[in-house]
Amino acid sequence: MKKLVAIILLLFSFPAGNAAAEETKEPEIISEAAIVTDSESGAVLYAKNADKKMYPASLTKIATAIYAIEHGDLSDLATVSKKAAETEGTRVYLEEGELVPLKKLVQGMLVNSGNDAAWSIAEHLDGNIEAFSQNLNRYLKEKAGLKNTHFVNPHGLYDENHYTTAADLAKLTNYALKNETFREIYGTKELKWTGKSWDTTIFTHHRMLKGEVPFEGVTGGKTGFVDEAKQTLATSAEYDSIKLTAIVLKAEYKRDIYNDTKNLLDYGHSNFETAELSSSEVFPSDGKTYTTGGANIPITLPKGNYEENITAKGKLQIKNENGRIIQSVKLIEDKQDEVVSSQFKTDKEPVKETTGYYGKAGLALFLFGIFILVLRKNLKAKARRRRRRV
């Protein structure tokens, strides 16, 4: 009896609303523009000036790398031109006439940020920088879905007409991370380099990836700097329940881009997880049913309270407890009558349906009713025993 009373009191002690943890405060960011996204679903978890026109510096090389990987033969030998060998800025010290495999050029460009390697890639793929830039911009628009990016060189040295946004860079990086070769090079910490004039070991410039700024989960990254762009940084990280991409642009000091990145990653993996819309699921709404169109679609869920609804146009929207749309997925109307209850799947466990206050209150009332029935039965039994004694 005491146990039953304790259960009822416990149920009535729940506060109104979902008992899940509240979303923590958004990160404080010093850099002029920043964004953190779910690398798999693309959902924007936090953004600051994400659509503002910015200069990327060497983050440009992410675009050059994935373009080269997808459009070139990585085993091809590229001939280093005089102009490539004389490219200013960070280099891997290529010499005019040197023959270098395309993959090695991509490695030298991403790991050691070699501008000479980037120039050689562009000339090898498209003959000259002008043709390369035209083809690269078309590729970025058509393949990666970038809308506010225009590049005029392969390395990111300043040009007024060479610009992008934090949102586009995150979208680009997420696209590139789907490629295994890109992920391998992007996550390389050190690499033995044997060249015509330079035998050494090259190291990533990304301090979190290298371990100089310790931080759990970092799997890849790229640094950037020119006077006009200031410090820029791209970072990928992986945790049990989510993979993240963080971009920070235009910070005065290196410590700021790393602190901002840590804050973005902390916020992302503490508050969100990646789930999956199964190809077999059917979503009912206003007398219609919708499906994913036969595909398994990654989707991002807040770890605290969230709401899901389907709009009149068939978009599944996930909103956090403040009503902000975390992700919107276009569904396909299903003409069949079968309706299957939808439930998101996560890597850890299925997402639990929320009961809410009234659900808990109903359960409590049900148990309270049982308690009354048991109590009445016990009282009647005691009364019968007393009558027998008399």
Q: Where do the model's predicted regions map?
A:
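Positively charged n-region of N-terminal signal peptides that target proteins for export
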Residues: 1-4
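Bacterial N-terminal signal peptides
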Residues: 7-14
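Hydrophobic alpha-helical membrane context
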Residues: 14-15, 73, 272
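Active-site-adjacent loops and short helices of periplasmic peptidoglycan-processing enzymes
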Residues: 19-184
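Domain-terminus/edge residues, biased toward the C-terminal soluble/receptor-binding domains
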Residues: 146, 158-163, 167-390
